[in-house]
């Protein structure tokens, strides 16, 4: 039997908005430690990893490890029926082929329940190795979102370079080029406005902007974003989910040859 009660129901709504455009169907895995999801996008270029730790829920009951296959578009439609202040409870019985979402208004004068059919989804669990990253950039998530959006109007690939001068985001397209440089800035009134750059080695990697823009759908979840870069490794773009977990997006860098053979 599974029963998870989340007082901040809006968090779950934001989590779904952050992953549903990247992944269509996925297994949510429940264990005693938390509620998690790990899935590749349909083109097998990006990976999303979500964890909501059990202690972040007001009530968390998971008698045995359970994997629930869901269509994220359908799940998002159901969660849109919840008010932003609603308390959301997720329930599933052992062996059942449905999951129930219950929405309670804070005043408890309205309770709605929605039942959704589960799916059988084959998914391989990918071991994500812990890696030492050459450069780690922590910056305001709204700023990162704005940079990705602005650069998308010029080109389709972003080059992220970290040097001792700072972090540079650049692109080139038919209409011209764009470079945006951010320098480390920790003398801010609010810690979430800081730009912190930890550079062990300089890096310069190219990524598809359409994926980066998709990752920025997680911006409402966190005021800061952490970007971890190493040559030869996928970039990790991480947003914290309140105090209870994270969403991490992994994206393989573009290889130089691919850029030379642009379709005519």
Curated annotation (Swiss-Prot):
Is Ion transport given among the entry's keywords? no
Q: What's in the GO CC field?
A: nucleus
The subcellular localization recorded is: Nucleus
What residues are annotated to bind DNA? 61-80
Keyword annotations for this protein, in alphabetical order, are:
DNA replication, DNA-binding, Nucleus
Q: Which domain of life is it from?
A: Eukaryota
Q: What does this protein do?
A: This protein is an auxiliary protein of DNA polymerase delta and is involved in the control of eukaryotic DNA replication by increasing the polymerase's processibility during elongation of the leading strand. May be involved in UV resistance.
Q: What is this protein called?
A: Proliferating cell nuclear antigen 2
Task: Give the organism, scientific name.
Answer: Arabidopsis thaliana
